[in-house]
């Protein structure tokens, strides 16, 4: 377990707000009480983990006590004040050396929907680790992580979509503008094609994709920004493609939600 200030820093007790935990998920449930019981009796002799694929309303109010180590959050006695803490050394070892990725990189392999989603989860973990390393100034290790991600979860078997716009930024921050531009263009291809498809539907049908429209607009903004900063020769061409969709129904719906989210965040 990662100890922020050494073994002497382990607190004597954890203070968990049951009120906040109950409010977040509409009440306390038996599984929450079971988690608290395990924490009370476990005395940190055995580690306790929570899967990254769980919704945060399943964390029993322990969000600020979780540290990401790979595909799971480890429950710790430390209150970090926010969710999203990463043990970069342990996570690096898990993603780069311990985890096995099967035949995902084999060209022509069939990827069913469930397997594809799991691969996307793994890719997201690579991205979170690379982002953490970039922020700590460890660009060489960040590049290693991004290259490993590209090697074991290539886009020819798990295509880039609106979830991968940050990947372009990460390549750019790590110093590889060529790969950043390649990823950004793949993401923008997906985003614009999906919007074009949505625009072929009725407004009522488009409205059912409101959340997706928001994610795509967010993705377009980030990927377009990354592409423009790389100095790629096709950057203006992609910018023009995005501009041509600005006044279409799906883009406008996504922009409305995006602007609302930005206002709420202020």
Named regions from a protein language model:
Residues 1-266:
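ER/secretory pathway lumenal C-terminal domains and tails of membrane proteins involved
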């Amino acid at each position: 377990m990662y100890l922020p200030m050494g073994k002497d820093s382990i607190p004597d007790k954890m203070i968990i707000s049951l009120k906040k935990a109950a409010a977040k998920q509409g009440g306390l449930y038996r599984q929450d009480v079971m988690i608290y019981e395990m924490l009370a009796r476990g005395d940190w002799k055995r580690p306790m983990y929570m899967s990254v694929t769980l919704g945060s309303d399943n964390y029993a109010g322990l969000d600020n006590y979780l540290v990401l180590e790979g595909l799971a959050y480890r429950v710790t006695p430390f209150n970090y004040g926010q969710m999203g803490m990463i043990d970069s050394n342990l996570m690096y070892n898990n993603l780069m050396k311990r985890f096995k990725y099967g035949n995902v990189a084999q060209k022509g392999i069939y990827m069913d929907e469930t397997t594809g989603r799991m691969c996307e989860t793994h890719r997201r973990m690579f991205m979170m680790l690379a982002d953490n390393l970039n922020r700590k100034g460890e660009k060489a290790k960040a590049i290693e992580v991004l290259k490993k991600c590209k090697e074991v979860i290539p886009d020819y078997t798990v295509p880039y979509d609106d979830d991968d716009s940050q990947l372009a930024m990460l390549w750019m921050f790590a110093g590889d503008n060529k790969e950043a531009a390649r990823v950004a263009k793949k993401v923008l291809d997906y985003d614009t094609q999906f919007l074009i498809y949505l625009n072929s539907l009725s407004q009522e049908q488009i409205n059912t994709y409101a959340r997706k429209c928001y994610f795509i607009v967010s993705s377009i903004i980030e990927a377009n920004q990354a592409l423009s900063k790389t100095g790629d020769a096709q950057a203006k061409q992609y910018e023009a493609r995005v501009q041509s969709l600005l006044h279409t129904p799906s883009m406008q719906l996504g922009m409305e939600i995006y602007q609302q989210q930005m206002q709420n965040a202020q």
